[in-house]
Amino acid sequence: MAMQQFDNQISVTQINPAEHYSPAPLKKTSSLNHENVASDAKIVLATINAKYIHASLGLRYLYANLKELQSCCEIKEFVIQTRAIDIVEQILEAKPDIVGFGVYIWNIIETTNVVSLLKVVAPEIKIVLGGPEVSYEAEQQDIVASADFVLTGAADISFYQLCKDIINKTEPEQKILKSTPVELKDLELPYQYYSDEDLKNRLLYVEASRGCPFKCEFCLSSLDTASNPFELELFLDQMDILYQRGARNFKFIDRTFNLNIATTMQIMQFFLDRMTDDLFLHFEVVPDHLPRKLKELLTLFPDGSLQFEVGIQTFNPEVQTNISRKQNNPKSKENLIWLKDNTSAHIHADLIFGLPGETFETFRESFNELYQCRPHEIQLGILKRLKGSPIIRHTETFDLRFNPLPPFNILSTDRVDFATMQLINRFARYWDMIGNSGRFKHSLAHILSDNPFDEFMALTNWLFEKTGQTHQINLKRLYELVSQAVEALFPEKHALIISIIELDYAASKLKSHFGTLHLYAGEQTKSSGQNKLAQRQQRHKL
């Protein structure tokens, strides 16, 4: 990833890495050669995914570009819920000499625990870290203190070079190594290393381009200088191989998929020509760049085949200027409405709360404007401090205060106090359960009217006061709570909502009958009897 040249006035803590890393020459006395590498060393590539359905594209790129070392390498993927000690056990089963970890904001805590344990149990193993979470401000991180090497930036090639040096006993003296920029034409593509199990059960991440020309300061892609495409014919050949093997779920990680319309059209036509009932494509699109010819093509895709992730973030021009975001707001709204009315694409639109200059009131306006565009989902994100992102240049000016622990979310600004930030966090969580889940697709539109933000905020406050929780609410109980909240907050709507919410409840396919729900606040839920501890004690007496 290209480095951003910052102004001297910008307060950014950067690491001081060595010059671009190049491999040391092989020692003349070394017995290493391409034929005996596999018997001389063992490499494990590992990462901790947020969910099982996520397959690591980054690890597969590293594996694809290991050349003669590939035969002695193994990929091991884990999920967040796995205990660190169990991950260490599974890694050690491979008897590795080198372990490379992909480190991201969602797995930094868990990976730190694994690396710490691994260094205690098997200190002789060389641990190499890479990924966005350790590519910046690395020297201040606990995980780096435990590791042997850190490769910053795109490590597709530099990981191979470092492994050769470690195996050959010519490893560099520096711990933090800056990867040489990668020419995409020099990369071996990784798609053949998706297994049949991956194709059957997991999301397949693919990329037709790398980088982003936009400079939105909350995003690490703002450090890129441009969006660089892979050779299109080669990329489509790889997609065809995946398709012929049975792949039907493709998630493009391109930051700006519709930047080059000619390329976008060819990729879309490629998949349209192979359309089946189970083919599903996921793209991140620029909201104000949908020319007529692309629109015409999009109308040809059947229901259930497309999902568009549309980054709006904010409609406030002042905030957009603060974060260097260029967006034609009227055109973005027009295109969102057009997509909803004229295509079968599932539209997932993003807003971010806590941006420099944003207030409760301006965020309310952005939410209401986006709601009127009628996307299927509105993802309400809370600003996070991604290491290396230019957003931190605003820290003093806007008194940005971030959580020191992952996920490094914003806690307050000069415009938004901590209590308000917590309020929006609850709003976002309830919106995800009620608005984005699709569980209330019939009734929610009737609960909210001309002022959806304030009405849903009232619902948020009522639900939290009633339950004191934003997680682990039983679905049947959630239907009851929403009905009771409407009775308390909007009594004139309650009779209508009861009749409509029955449609939502039926769609949920819960086993209990709708007539058994407590839809009125005055109804008392029957006691569940003994609490769990008493039940446990009672079993020992039987």
Regions found by a protein language model. Name each.
Residues 1-48, 67-68, 84, 91, ...:
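Radical SAM enzyme core and accessory elements
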Residues 2-245:
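Acidic, low-complexity intrinsically disordered segments
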Residues 56-59, 85, 111-112, 232, ...:
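Conserved strand-to-helix beginnings and helix N-cap segments that scaffold or border functional pockets
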Residues 65-69, 117-121, 144-146, 165, ...:
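Alpha-helical structural signal in soluble globular domains
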Residues 82, 154, 230, 259-262, ...:
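Residue-level signal for the nucleotide or nucleotide-sugar donor/cofactor binding architecture
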Residues 98-100, 126-128, 236, 243-253, ...:
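Conserved C-terminal portion of the radical SAM core fold
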Residues 188-341, 345:
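Radical SAM [4Fe-4S] cluster-binding motif and immediate context
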